[in-house]
Amino acid sequence: MRLDSAAKALFLKEFVGAFALSMRYFFKPRPTLNYPHEKNPQSPRYRGEHALRRYPNGEERCIACKLCEAICPAKAITIEAGPRRNDGTRRTTRYDIDMVKCIYCGFCQEACPVDAIVEGPNAEFAVETREELYYDKDRLLQNGARWEREIARNIALDAPYR
């Protein structure tokens, strides 16, 4: 037994094994990314910052059906509907989302019959104060205008699975 221990110590078996393992990983490509300069590709189903969409003619998509408000498990959505218009449709006068309460489950997006509320591709919306995470209708519409191209592409890619 002593001879075996002496042979291992003499030939530095553990050191050579560890060094060989290190060299194997040293020459492989790095699995890490240099964030924020490099980013992982996102799934079309990624759930990020909320946005309200418009139709191509500029009209808001939201018809004030309040399904998203009803289905939200965190009760983070508040909607107030305006009076009916001449054509019988309604629009929202207030559409607020408390992003502090939101759990990003995507139920609001699934419940919406006209794809008005969506969770967009933006994951970088860090803020300095809690009040900035209370989104009103104007902020949601701005997000929709900002990310419309990516949102439309993601919805089109996901359409066969809906």
UniProtKB/Swiss-Prot annotation:
Q: Where in the cell is it found?
A: Cell inner membrane
Is Cell inner membrane among this UniProt entry's keywords?
Answer: yes
* GO term, biological process aspect, one: aerobic respiration
| EC number(s) stated in the UniProt entry for this protein | 7.1.1.-
List, alphabetically, the Pfam families matched. Answer: Fer4_7
Q: Which residues bind [4Fe-4S] cluster 1?
A: 62, 65, 68, 112
* Reactions that this protein is recorded to catalyse: a quinone + NADH + 5 H(+)(in) = a quinol + NAD(+) + 4 H(+)(out)
Cofactor(s) recorded in Swiss-Prot or TrEMBL: [4Fe-4S] cluster
How, per the record, is the cofactor bound?
Binds 2 [4Fe-4S] clusters per subunit.
Xref: SUPFAM superfamilies: 4Fe-4S ferredoxins
Q: Where is the 4Fe-4S ferredoxin-type domain?
A: 52-82, 93-122
The protein's matches in InterPro entries, at most eight in alphabetical order, are given as:
4Fe4S_Fe-S-bd, 4Fe4S_Fe_S_CS, NADH_quinone_OxRdtase_chainI
Specify the superkingdom.
Answer: Bacteria
The residues that the entry says bind [4Fe-4S] cluster 2 are 72, 102, 105, 108
The record gives the membrane topology as: Peripheral membrane protein
Q: Which GO terms describe its cellular component?
A: plasma membrane
Described by its record, this protein's role is as follows: NDH-1 shuttles electrons from NADH, via FMN and iron-sulfur (Fe-S) centers, to quinones in the respiratory chain. The immediate electron acceptor for the enzyme in this species is believed to be ubiquinone. Couples the redox reaction to proton translocation (for every two electrons transferred, four hydrogen ions are translocated across the cytoplasmic membrane), and thus conserves the redox energy in a proton gradient.
**UniProt record similarity statement:** Belongs to the complex I 23 kDa subunit family.
The protein's matches in PANTHER family, at most eight in alphabetical order, are given as: NADH DEHYDROGENASE [UBIQUINONE] IRON-SULFUR PROTEIN 8, MITOCHONDRIAL, NADH DEHYDROGENASE UBIQUINONE IRON-SULFUR PROTEIN 8, MITOCHONDRIAL
Subunit composition?
A: NDH-1 is composed of 14 different subunits. Subunits NuoA, H, J, K, L, M, N constitute the membrane sector of the complex.
Identification of the protein by name? NADH-quinone oxidoreductase subunit I
Gene behind this protein: nuoI
